[in-house]
């Protein structure tokens, strides 16, 4: 609905990220076109099997997480004990190895996590509170990107080239 409303107002929409239970990625692709970026959350108990078997023909990347418990991802899932399911760096590395599309990680990601996260083989990260709750949000964003660039061993060049400049 938001995409259609934005497009009706003449606003350029470069992409969308959807959850597994949101609007189907095929519908997103139909409305946004082949040049758009479409991401899909990969948050299941059987994440490894899901990533190996899901149809990725309509998506550009998987969003994986959370790395840490965070208020911005209250619906990310809980285990049988009611504890929020988070992903370890080891799990994230395995996901990056088996995924047929680029992987980005989010959910509680902080600057201190970036060096280790960059070494997992994922293609990027996404944050909310690390920037929005910072005393200087612009500097926080700059620090995150600089640190990533310093430590990253893998990067999705095609996705970066499509990235919208802020």
Predicted features along the sequence, with ranges:
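Histidine/lysine/aspartate-rich catalytic loop segments that bind and position anionic ligands
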Residues: 40-84, 95
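Glycine-rich phosphate-binding active-site loops on the catalytic face of alpha/beta enzymes
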Residues: 11-30, 61-78, 114-147
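Alpha-helix-loop-beta-strand connector modules within alpha/beta enzyme cores
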Residues: 20, 27-44, 80-111, 144-159
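Catalytic cores of alpha/beta
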Residues: 1-11, 27-28, 45-58, 99, ...
């Amino acid at each position: 609905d938001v995409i259609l409303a934005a497009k009706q107002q003449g606003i350029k929409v470069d992409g969308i990220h959807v959850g597994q239970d949101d609007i189907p990625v095929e519908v997103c692709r139909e409305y946004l076109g082949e040049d758009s970026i479409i991401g899909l959350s990969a948050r299941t108990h059987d994440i490894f099997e899901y990533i190996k078997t899901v149809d990725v023909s309509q998506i550009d990347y998987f969003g994986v997480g959370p790395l840490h418990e965070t208020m911005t991802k209250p619906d990310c899932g809980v285990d049988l004990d009611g504890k929020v399911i988070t992903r370890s760096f080891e799990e994230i590395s395995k996901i990056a190895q088996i995924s047929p599309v680029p992987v980005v990680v989010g959910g509680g990601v902080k600057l201190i996590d970036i060096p280790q996260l960059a070494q997992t083989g994922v293609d990027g990260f996404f944050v909310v509170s690390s920037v929005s709750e910072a005393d200087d949000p612009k500097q926080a964003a700059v620090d995150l990107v600089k640190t990533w660039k310093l430590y990253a061993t893998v990067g999705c060049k095609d996705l970066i080239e499509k990235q919208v400049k802020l």
